[in-house]
């Protein structure tokens, strides 16, 4: 039985430890040991069981009996909490805990236990533990430090030990308190309770150290956190403290923690804010105030005060949007004047705003709603503050008898519930936008005075809070996002009017043969009616597209619509009428031209008035004047001219910026219209006139339109492609000019000056000074430079180097930690501190390597004078540095080693050498040919000194020193000097007695140790360091960092005075860390992630093994054997993927940089701990440096479902916990949900949601800091914005950088963050920046060609593209995640993204729109960069581009784009259009040009018009058509996409490398890739606008080198590319077959080469760029898989990946609405043209053009369909029916074949006719299939759906076979696969990587 009991105990312990190991990431870090790590969540939340068990583990070795007492108490607490063990894991925990207790009892060897004495034993141990750890002394010292106003003098390691001691003491006190209740009340129990009472009063330190806090310990003072004693923080705390004139709080109101009451307590009592919200915003305000104060000045230590200016700055910035809102609505703010309210009132208002915002949840997306709430609550507060006693607010009373208040329940919940009810109508994103109110609709309700109808408290029956009932929709506010392309016309009406009028004018001039006379002028005046009619169309669209908002829209807005509609309706009629009269006058001779003059007068007056208003409203210089005018007449016309919104006012720039972007566009437009006139319009004039005057001819088919209308369709087919290119090619000119401007600006900004590691070597000498000028704060520069101000430049350079060295070395260390460098490279790259007594600058060894040896060779070969030798050495300046350093270092080292006679010898030697140098007789004094021997003896000495001292080494060093002495004396010195030394009595006596150099002083001084090691390397490293570092990434980073030192950037301020900021990363469920199993799990080719990375990054793998102390032969099993090494391996792999771990590491470099900067600043000022100054990593141990960094930097990762992941024990939760342990400053916010009772005591009912913030405690477990209840599920929109929104309340500072979880950062870039933040105070136009754009480096482009294309394309946009957008165009928005936001500006204006479902799918760009509309300013800066990962496989890239294109499709419908398009001035509007949605419109136009051209050509071929007119009109060689097609082709293949790319290459790589890179890209088929991407963007953009369906597409960010199956590619690209490519191919075939040209088929091919290229790219790009796409074995497997998928029957629950039927149904899901069905029907009608045209081209029909022929073709088609159905039909019942069916099928087939044979033999039907019929019937069948899919419900009712589905299967099978056949054919030839591998992975081959091993797979290696 004992054995069973023992085994059970072992099993339970092992299970608990394994569970704990899994929950702590199978690694080290700070892990909760023992049972404390296995406490179930249900027990841990309610008690301190885990803390008690942790204390038991801590003291187990000191006193097992006390540990047993603690365990027993923990068991009792668990039993009391959950007696039935109902909670998850509780039973296992209790069993394990009881097992531990029994083991502890068993170890007592049978000794009895007197439990009555447990409390006494515990009490004695408590006192002993306090004495042992000097707790009382520590508390006394802490009190002294606090009284002196400084922090406790201790480093981080000691602080952690102290906190653990305090935690243990607190657990002991808690157990003592519980046990004392059961003790003898008259005995020891009473005395202990009395003692405990005294302890709890006096021992505030215990609770202070263990009270959870975020950054500042406000609840209780902490001795381990220095932030609380910073004077600015103390001043801020003092500023909000409760004063006598505040209303008195009730006596029973509980003040949390050990602090004094403050104004937040009063606000909590009055309005019922949540306690944790109050705690959170209290810290928020304290940090905001303290940072505002620090930027003005640091207060004094004694009684610090916050300056009034700091309070005013915070007040005005926080309430800026509220003040503007009041001004817009013409209501009075809650205070009279700023000067009239005192400081406390200001802080009360700011505190109130923060508290409202902090608890508003989803209502934070409604900034003006928050203004409304604040306005009313501030008025309530104002009244309450006048009372002597605090009184609760009526608006927040919950209605219960207790008189309790709840802001959340009374104010936020009603609004949230209304929003939530509206989102239900969204139907998961499928409903039309017009069917429901989104966030913008709710917010814009508060843009009108009607919002005050809500009253206060808000009326629940108001229209605003009305919830949708049934199918009745609630009205929108002021804009309705109807799904239509017409939004493009409406939003950018001025652009389209301008383009069409210019086209009309140029066409008129061309047709008038450029005769600019009065007649031409009269015709040009036709632009007047065009202008009026287009404006009338806009007004008509305004009226139509406002449908759905009339009942809620402002009356003024509707009035403006009506007025404009009537104005333009009557105006267009008037202008058209008068212009017709002008034309009548023109045609009648002898007219007085009355109407012409009147017409001119009307147009002139209108143009003048319009110009004046345009100047006043849009021109920067006149805008202020128009704003000041209060004339009602003027304001009326201004209102008619431009709608007035709360946003979008003041969208103008200063005059200089305005002139710049106007000049830019004038150049673009001049180029565009010159090209359009001479190469597009003018060449078409003659052919058009020829066609119009062409005599009638016989059409080949039954013509309906052209014959009687001057060949109208022929002219349309001629002009349509040219018009399409005309509308698109302005983007080409924009791209060209922006590339040129961007390149010039980049060169001016000094980008690319240092582009190779050789240039880093050459210019290294200038780096320290540049670094000191830009990146060192003036405070630090003043101290060292002041000391050397009177000295020479050498001392200045040394001072600069001393500033530079700690930063450079830390950068090098970070590169080593990231395994980009080896240990040797780190030593070579490190720079000495330059703070020693050496008289010259010491440079890194990689600059000096082998220089000494070369100098020795020069000296040994020198036959000239000393001056000549020195000149030769100085030709290489670093050689001169090396020689000088070697000389002075040898002198210093020798003097430090020897004494007495030895020192005298050293001094004499160096004195003689110095004298010789001064006299120029060095070559006489020394025998330079012996230098090599001398150096060899000295390196022997230093080789010993660099090791740790031992007796043997000491003897060896003494001998080596003597050998050195002998060589110097007898070989190096001249004969005369040698004789002098030999006869020197003191020296001779010591030598003879054996005392000379008998004792060597081993180096102890850190400076000497550093010099010895450095000198040894300097003398022994023989190979040149030109290739140091050899890692390409390390080179790139060092090149960019050193280059950025010479770029313009603001001056860095001291850390204490810098702008504080937060970094914010949203995370859902992506990879955090790769698990050990994921590292080794193999794909179908036997490739694991670890194997892949070892081959791709071989040098980094070797560096990693070196770092962890392993040899290169170490295997995976060896690494797994060590938990530490296994964890390091997981991190190493994760840091090379797109993981959260990589992002967190990168962002935490900010803290490391700030700690280093703060530490060095404090050390420079002499205020830091002297004991840490000489520590290698002293800044990391400095408590003050850490506190200063935490005051200025916060990092919050918003892990939306972290709570669920923890409950489900997902590995992601474990890994996030591991990151929390590794980075103490990391904070994780997440949404926690709890099931609450339904009111009758049962479980279930509804859920409550909480926004929580956690950090790691001292034991590595999650410690909850804040828990704020939400009104409901926050995910009402897109998800990601709400994830950001719930967590943004936990951010701090004045700036916030948004970082996605696929990004990275680097220490050298983090050092420049202070400079970047100063840009917020810089001058960038008339407004200060609100978003700082940051350059990105795409780190995923290093291996495959696709990744390289994508990274180059992305890099060109995020550098050159955004450079031009920000300046001079002033239209940069927020495109990605490294941008830095003005935090206060944005959190008071709706946040950093928008969240409405579907319409805000591209949520981040709306932050830029919102910032711009609210008078923000967005800049771009390139001296700092952030790493970014991108998708690397074609499928991932296609999904990503589809997501972005779909998002742009939704933007077309959005109100933000509409308002920017309407409110920007004309030129800025064009910049905005062509850089946002216009880019996708032009992309779509490129594809449409192909369609328009080919359909036009096919029309000409079918109709016979081409043959009739080709000789006279010469269409095939027409200049305009050629120009149009050439422009289309160049856009299609990505030439203009590559232009900015090439310019970026030239700028940053150099001209030759740029040319080589561009040619390489072409050889790697980048044009195929860009053409394919063109189709992706066109498909998703167009389909989104037509049908919607834009959604977030998870692209996956793994390592992609695996083969994608044929079926996977077919599913993804079938409808977006393949169908369209086959349509274009069919058009081309028909064009070749029936078109007419003198040159034959070859001319057709040449004319349509771009179209053929498009077909091939769209059909085969997925397979060309598919790894192993042409390997025969994989081709066979792909075919089998595809056939299996195609024939697999679908059903309920069967996914599209498994069955063609399921996939086919999914592909039709986007067709939802009647409008969509009608549009699809219209688009499908084009396919009927093929059959209609081919029928009349058959030999059978000859020249018959009767319409009946087309009818007969339909009869044939019906017969074919019937036969198909007959052959496809398969009965499932009787075998007799089956036999009859087979007989019928046989007869039918024979009959059909016989009829065809007879028809061919007896009629004119030919074999080519048969193929022609196939060409005609295939598109008709596709049209019928498309129509059937569109009207699916009708077909289902008719019972034809099964037949339709089988037709669909046949079409997909046929398309698949046509694509697959060439692939199968090419797979026969092995060299094709080899060529493809080189094509795809050229980057890897050029780096010498073993990519072939990866592609071949690792199966063979595994099997053998």
Curated annotation (Swiss-Prot):
It comes from the Eukaryota. It catalyses: [(1->3)-beta-D-glucosyl](n) + UDP-alpha-D-glucose = [(1->3)-beta-D-glucosyl](n+1) + UDP + H(+). GO terms for cellular component: 1,3-beta-D-glucan synthase complex; Golgi apparatus; plasma membrane; plasmodesma. The keyword Cell membrane applies. GO terms for molecular function: 1,3-beta-D-glucan synthase activity. It is an enzyme of class 2 (transferase). One of its GO terms (biological process) is pollen development. SMART domains: FKS1_dom1. InterPro entries: FKS1-like_dom1 (IPR026899), Glyco_trans_48_dom (IPR003440). It is found in: Cell membrane. Belongs to the glycosyltransferase 48 family. This is Callose synthase 10. The gene is CALS10.
């Amino acid at each position: 039985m004992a054995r069973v009991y023992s085994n059970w105990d072992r099993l339970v312990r092992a299970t608990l430890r394994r569970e704990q190991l899994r929950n702590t990431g199978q690694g080290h870090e700070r892990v909760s040991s023992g049972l404390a790590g296995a406490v179930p969540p249900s027990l841990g939340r309610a008690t301190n069981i885990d803390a008690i068990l942790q204390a038991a583990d801590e003291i187990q070795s000191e006193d097992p009996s006390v540990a047993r007492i603690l365990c027993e108490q923990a068991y009792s607490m668990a039993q009391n909490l959950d007696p039935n063990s109902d909670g998850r894991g509780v039973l296992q925990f209790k069993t394990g805990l009881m097992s531990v207790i029994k083991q502890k009892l068993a170890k007592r060897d049978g000794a009895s236990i007197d439990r009555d004495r447990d409390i006494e034993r515990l009490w004695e141990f408590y006192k002993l533990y306090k004495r042992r750890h000097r707790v009382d002394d520590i508390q006394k010292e802490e009190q002294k430090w606090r009284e002196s106003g400084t922090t406790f003098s201790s480093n981080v390691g000691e602080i952690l030990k102290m906190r653990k001691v305090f935690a243990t003491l607190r657990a002991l006190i808690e157990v003592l308190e519980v046990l004392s209740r059961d003790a003898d009340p008259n005995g020891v129990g009473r005395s202990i309770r009395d003692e405990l009472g005294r302890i709890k009063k006096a021992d505030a330190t215990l609770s202070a150290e263990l009270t959870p806090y975020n950054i500042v310990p406000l609840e209780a003072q902490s001795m381990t956190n220095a932030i609380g004693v910073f004077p600015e923080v103390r001043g801020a705390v003092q500023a909000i403290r409760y004063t006598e004139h505040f209303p008195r709080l009730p006596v029973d109101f509980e003040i949390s923690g050990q602090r004094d009451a403050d104004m937040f307590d009063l606000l909590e009592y009055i309005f019922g804010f949540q306690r944790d919200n109050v705690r959170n915003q209290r810290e928020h305000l304290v940090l905001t105030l303290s940072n505002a104060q620090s930027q003005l000045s640091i207060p004094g230590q004694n009684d610090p005060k916050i300056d009034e200016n700091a309070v005013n700055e915070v007040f005005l910035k926080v309430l800026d949007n509220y003040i503007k809102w009041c001004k817009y609505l013409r209501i009075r703010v809650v205070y009279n004047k700023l000067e009239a309210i005192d400081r406390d009132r200001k802080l009360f208002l700011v505190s109130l705003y923060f508290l409202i915002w902090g608890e508003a949840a989803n209502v934070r997306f409604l900034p003006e709603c928050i203004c409304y709430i604040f306005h009313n609550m501030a008025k309530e507060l104002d009244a309450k503050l006048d009372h002597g006693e605090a009184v609760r607010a009526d608006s927040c009373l919950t209605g219960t008898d207790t008189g309790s208040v709840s802001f959340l329940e009374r104010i936020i919940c009603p609004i949230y519930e209304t929003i939530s009810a509206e989102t239900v109508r969204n139907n998961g994103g499928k409903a039309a936008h017009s069917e429901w109110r989104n966030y913008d609709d709710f917010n814009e309700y508060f843009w009108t005075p009607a919002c005050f109808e809500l009253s206060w408290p808000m009326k629940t029956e108001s229209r605003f809070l009305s919830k949708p009932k049934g199918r009745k929709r609630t009205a929108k506010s002021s804009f309705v996002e109807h799904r239509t392309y017409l939004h493009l016309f409406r939003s950018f009406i001025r652009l389209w009017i301008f383009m069409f009028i210019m086209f009309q004018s140029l066409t008129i001039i061309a047709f008038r043969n450029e005769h600019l006379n009065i007649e031409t002028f009269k015709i040009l005046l036709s632009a007047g009616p065009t202008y009026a009619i287009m404006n009338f169309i806009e007004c008509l669209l305004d009226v139509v597209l406002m449908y759905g908002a009339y009942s809620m829209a402002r009356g003024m807005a509707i009035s403006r619509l009506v007025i404009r509609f009537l104005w333009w309706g009557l105006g267009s009629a008037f202008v058209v009428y008068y212009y017709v009269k002008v034309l009548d006058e023109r045609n009648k001779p002898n007219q007085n031209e009355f109407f012409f003059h009147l017409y001119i007068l009307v147009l002139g007056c209108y143009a003048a008035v319009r110009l004046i208003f345009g100047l006043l409203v849009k021109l920067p210089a006149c805008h202020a004047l128009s704003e000041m005018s209060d004339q009602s007449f003027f304001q009326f016309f201004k209102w008619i001219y431009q709608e007035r919104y709360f946003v979008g006012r003041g969208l103008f720039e200063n005059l200089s910026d305005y002139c710049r972007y106007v000049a830019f566009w004038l150049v673009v437009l001049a180029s565009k219209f010159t090209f359009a006139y001479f190469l597009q319009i003018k060449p078409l004039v003659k052919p058009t006139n020829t066609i119009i005057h062409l005599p009638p001819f016989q059409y080949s088919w039954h013509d309906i339109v052209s014959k009687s209308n001057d060949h109208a369709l022929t002219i349309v087919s001629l002009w349509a492609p040219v018009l399409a290119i005309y509308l698109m090619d302005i983007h080409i000119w924009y791209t060209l000019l922006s590339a040129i401007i961007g390149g010039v600006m980049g060169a001016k900004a000094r980008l690319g000056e240092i582009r190779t590691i050789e240039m880093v070597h050459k210019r290294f000498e200038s780096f320290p000074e540049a670094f000191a000028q830009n990146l060192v704060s003036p405070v630090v520069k003043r101290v060292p430079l002041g000391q050397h101000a009177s000295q020479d430049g050498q001392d200045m350079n040394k001072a600069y180097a001393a500033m530079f060295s700690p930063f450079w070395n830390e950068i090098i260390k970070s590169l080593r930690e990231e395994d980009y460098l080896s240990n040797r490279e780190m030593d070579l790259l490190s720079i000495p501190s330059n703070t020693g007594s050496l008289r010259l600058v010491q440079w890194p060894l990689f600059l000096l390597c082998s220089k000494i040896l070369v100098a020795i060779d020069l000296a040994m070969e020198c036959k000239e004078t000393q001056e000549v030798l020195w000149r030769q050495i100085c030709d290489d300046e670093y050689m001169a540095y090396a020689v000088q350093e070697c000389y002075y270092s040898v002198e210093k080292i020798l003097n430090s080693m020897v004494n007495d006679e030895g020192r005298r010898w050293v001094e004499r030697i160096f004195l003689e050498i110095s004298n010789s140098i001064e006299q120029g007789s060095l070559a006489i004094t020394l025998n330079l040919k012996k230098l090599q021997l001398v150096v060899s003896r000295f390196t022997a000495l230093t080789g010993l000194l660099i090791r740790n001292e031992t007796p043997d080494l000491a003897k060896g060093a003494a001998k080596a020193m003597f050998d050195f002495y002998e060589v110097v004396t007898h070989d190096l010195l001249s004969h005369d000097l040698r004789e002098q030394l030999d006869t020197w009595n003191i020296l001779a006596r010591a030598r003879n007695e054996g005392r000379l150099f008998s004792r060597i002083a081993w180096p102890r001084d850190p400076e000497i140790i550093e010099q010895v090691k450095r000198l040894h390397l300097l003398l022994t490293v023989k190979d040149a360091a030109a290739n140091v570092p050899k890692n390409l990434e390390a080179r790139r980073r060092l090149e960019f960092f050193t280059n950025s030192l010479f770029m313009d950037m603001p001056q860095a301020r001291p850390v204490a005075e810098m702008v504080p900021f937060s970094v914010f990363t949203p995370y859902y469920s992506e990879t955090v860390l790769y698990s050990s199993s994921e590292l080794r799990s193999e794909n179908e080719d036997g490739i694991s992630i670890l194997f892949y990375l070892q081959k791709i990054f071989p040098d980094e793998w070797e560096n990693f093994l070196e770092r962890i102390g392993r040899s290169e032969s170490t295997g995976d099993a060896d690494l797994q054997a060590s938990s530490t090494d296994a964890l390091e391996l997981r991190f190493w792999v994760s840091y090379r993927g797109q993981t959260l771990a990589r992002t967190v590491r990168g962002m935490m470099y900010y803290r490391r940089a700030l700690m280093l900067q703060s530490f060095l600043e404090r050390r420079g000022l002499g205020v830091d701990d002297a004991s840490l100054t000489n520590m290698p990593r002293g800044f990391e141990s400095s408590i003050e440096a850490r506190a200063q960094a935490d005051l200025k930097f916060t990092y919050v990762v918003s892990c939306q479902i972290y709570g669920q992941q923890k409950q489900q024990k997902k590995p992601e939760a474990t890994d996030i916990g591991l990151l929390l342990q590794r980075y103490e400053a990391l904070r994780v916010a997440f949404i926690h949900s709890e099931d609450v009772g339904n009111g009758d005591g049962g479980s279930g009912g509804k859920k409550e949601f909480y926004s929580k913030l956690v950090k790691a405690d001292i034991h590595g477990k999650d410690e909850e800091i804040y828990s704020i209840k939400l009104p409901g599920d926050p995910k009402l929109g897109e998800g990601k914005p709400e994830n950001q929104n719930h967590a943004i309340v936990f951010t701090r500072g004045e700036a916030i950088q948004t970082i996605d979880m696929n990004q990275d950062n680097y220490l050298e870039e983090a050092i420049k963050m202070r400079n970047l933040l100063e840009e917020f105070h810089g001058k960038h136009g008339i407004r200060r920046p609100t978003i700082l754009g940051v350059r990105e480096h795409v780190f995923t482009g290093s291996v495959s060609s696709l990744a390289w294309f994508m990274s180059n394309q992305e890099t060109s946009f995020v550098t050159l593209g955004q450079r031009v957008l920000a300046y001079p165009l002033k239209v940069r928005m927020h495109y990605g995640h490294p941008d830095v936001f003005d935090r206060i500006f944005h959190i008071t204006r709706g946040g950093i993204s928008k969240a409405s479902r579907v319409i805000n799918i591209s949520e981040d760009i709306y932050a830029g729109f919102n910032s711009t509309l609210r008078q923000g300013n967005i800049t771009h800066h390139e001296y700092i960069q952030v790493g970014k990962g991108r998708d690397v496989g074609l499928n991932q890239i296609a999904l990503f581009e589809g997501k972005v294109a779909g998002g742009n499709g939704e933007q077309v419908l959005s109100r933000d784009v509409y308002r920017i398009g309407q409110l920007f001035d004309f030129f800025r509007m064009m910049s905005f259009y062509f850089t946002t949605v216009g880019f996708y419109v032009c992309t779509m136009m490129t594809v449409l040009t192909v369609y328009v051209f080919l359909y036009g050509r096919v029309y000409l071929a079918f109709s016979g018009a081409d043959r009739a007119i080709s000789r006279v009109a010469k269409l095939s060689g027409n200049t305009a058509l050629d120009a149009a097609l050439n422009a289309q082709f160049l856009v299609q293949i990505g030439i203009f996409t590559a232009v900015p790319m090439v310019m970026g290459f030239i700028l940053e790589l150099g001209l030759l490398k740029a040319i080589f890179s561009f040619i390489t890209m072409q050889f790697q088929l980048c044009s195929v890739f860009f053409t394919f991407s063109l189709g992706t963007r066109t498909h998703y953009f167009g389909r989104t606008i037509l049908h919607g369906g834009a959604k977030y597409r998870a692209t996956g960010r793994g390592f992609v080198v695996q083969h994608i199956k044929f079926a996977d590619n077919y599913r993804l690209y079938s409808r977006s590319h393949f169908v369209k490519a086959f349509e274009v191919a069919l058009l081309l075939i028909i064009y070749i077959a029936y078109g007419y040209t003198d040159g034959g088929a070859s001319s057709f091919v040449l004319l349509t080469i771009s179209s053929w290229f498009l077909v091939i790219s769209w059909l085969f790009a997925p397979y060309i760029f598919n790894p192993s796409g042409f390997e025969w074995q994989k081709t066979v497997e792909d075919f089998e898989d595809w056939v299996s998928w195609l024939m697999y029957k679908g059903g309920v629950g069967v996914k599209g990946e498994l069955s063609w039927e399921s996939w086919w149904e999914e592909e039709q899901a986007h067709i939802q609405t009647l409008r969509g069905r009608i549009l699809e029907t219209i688009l499908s009608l084009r396919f009927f043209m093929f059959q209609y045209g081919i029928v009349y081209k058959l030999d059978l029909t000859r020249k018959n053009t009767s319409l009946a022929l087309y009818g007969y073709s339909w009869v044939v088609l019906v017969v074919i369909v019937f036969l198909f159905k007959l052959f496809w039909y398969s009965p499932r019942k009787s075998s007799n029916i089956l036999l009859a069916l087979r007989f019928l099928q046989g007869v039918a087939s024979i009959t059909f074949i016989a009829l065809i044979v007879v028809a061919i033999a007896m009629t004119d039907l030919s074999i080519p006719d048969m193929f022609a019929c196939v060409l005609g019937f295939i598109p008709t069948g596709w049209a019928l299939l498309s129509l059937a899919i569109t009207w699916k419900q009708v077909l289902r009712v008719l019972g034809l759906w099964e037949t339709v589905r089988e037709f669909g299967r046949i079409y997909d099978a046929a398309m698949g076979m046509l694509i697959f056949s060439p692939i199968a054919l090419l797979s026969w030839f092995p060299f094709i696969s080899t060529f493809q591998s080189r094509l795809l992975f050229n980057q890897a081959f050029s780096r010498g990587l073993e990519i072939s091993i990866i592609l071949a797979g690792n199966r063979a290696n595994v099997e053998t």
